[in-house]
């Protein structure tokens, strides 16, 4: 994960000091890109331990179209708790937009089903996009989408994905997002009869919170280790049919976890 560490080092050395919504303050740059060849291994950070259970369950929760934290909490995942209301609701966040985007005439669009159909029947299309950024519903969201838009691309039998992340919390958020969309690429490739190619991460406002700088320096002092492999149950052929038990991580040998506070 040299690409990720290079971004962290660049922001520490060259980031502009900025204020932010949370009042914490950041070091920030605008515009950065990283590319991960998924043949090289699953891009899960090794310079600190990540909670893989949270990454998998959050992605399955998105794909369910769910916007209440009940499913996450039932599966030991608390990453959305700080933004939920007293009933566990988050408003029309990712799952709603992915699965039930509302049109002007009152109909809904299942962007994920549409994506899979397009990849299977018109792989060379340049319209394999899913957007979570719905200007008409942003005001009702507990947290507007940070990872706002993603696009798939087919070349031969290889499927690649590019994510645009408008707001990138480098220390806490970005490692989760890289792993989540790499996993989504493996899943989509499998159900479409393709091989996983590259995952491309593109960031807009890429920032380190000022209360994460010591943790970032500690992470940069650690030597990256070999990437693990994510094994996906080959029997699943429906993108909505995956369960947590269909994924197995092999060879993950990270450095210890580094604690850092979430800016809410």
Swiss-Prot record:
| Catalytic residues identified in the record | 146
Cystine pairings recorded for this chain: none
Under catalytic activity, the entry for this protein gives:
dUMP + (6R)-5,10-methylene-5,6,7,8-tetrahydrofolate = 7,8-dihydrofolate + dTMP
Compartments (UniProt record): Cytoplasm
Which parts of the sequence bind dUMP?
A: 21, 126-127, 166-169, 177, 207-209
Q: In which pathway does it act?
A: Pyrimidine metabolism; dTTP biosynthesis
**Which top class of enzyme applies to this chain?**
transferase
- Which E.C. number(s) belong to this protein? 2.1.1.45
Q: Which GO terms describe its cellular component?
A: cytosol
Task: Please report a single Pfam family linked to this protein.
Answer: Thymidylat_synt
Q: Which GO terms describe its molecular function?
A: thymidylate synthase activity
PANTHER family this protein is in? THYMIDYLATE SYNTHASE, THYMIDYLATE SYNTHASE 1
List the NCBIfam families hit by this protein, alphabetically: PRK01827.1-3, PRK01827.1-5, thym_sym
> What quaternary arrangement does the UniProt entry report?
Homodimer.
- This chain belongs to the protein called Thymidylate synthase
Where does this protein come from, organism-wise?
Answer: Aromatoleum aromaticum (strain DSM 19018 / LMG 30748 / EbN1) (Azoarcus sp. (strain EbN1))
């Amino acid at each position: 994960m040299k690409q990720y560490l290079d971004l962290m080092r660049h922001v520490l050395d060259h980031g502009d000091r900025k204020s932010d919504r949370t009042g914490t303050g950041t070091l920030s740059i605008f515009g950065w890109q990283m590319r991960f060849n998924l043949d090289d291994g699953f891009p899960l950070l090794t310079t600190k331990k990540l909670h893989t259970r949270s990454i998998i369950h959050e992605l399955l929760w998105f794909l369910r179209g769910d916007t209440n934290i009940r499913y996450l909490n039932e599966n030991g995942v608390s990453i959305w708790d700080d933004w939920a209301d007293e009933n566990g609701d988050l408003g029309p966040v990712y799952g709603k937009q992915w699965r039930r985007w509302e049109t002007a005439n009152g109909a809904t669009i299942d962007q994920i089903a549409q994506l899979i159909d397009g990849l299977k029947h018109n792989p060379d299309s340049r319209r394999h996009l899913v957007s979570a950024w719905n200007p008409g519903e942003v005001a009702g969201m507990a947290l507007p989408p940070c990872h706002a838009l993603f696009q798939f691309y087919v070349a031969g039998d290889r499927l690649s994905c590019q994510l645009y992340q408008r707001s990138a919390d480098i220390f806490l958020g970005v490692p989760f997002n890289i792993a989540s969309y790499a996993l989504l690429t493996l899943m989509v490739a499998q159900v479409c009869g393709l091989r996983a190619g590259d995952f491309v991460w593109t960031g807009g406002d890429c920032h380190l919170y000022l209360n994460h700088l010591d943790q970032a320096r500690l992470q940069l002092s650690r030597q990256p280790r070999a990437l693990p492999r994510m094994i996906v149950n080959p029997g699943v052929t429906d993108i909505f049919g995956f369960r947590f038990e269909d994924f197995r991580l092999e060879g993950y040998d990270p450095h210890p976890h580094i604690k850092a506070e979430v800016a809410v």
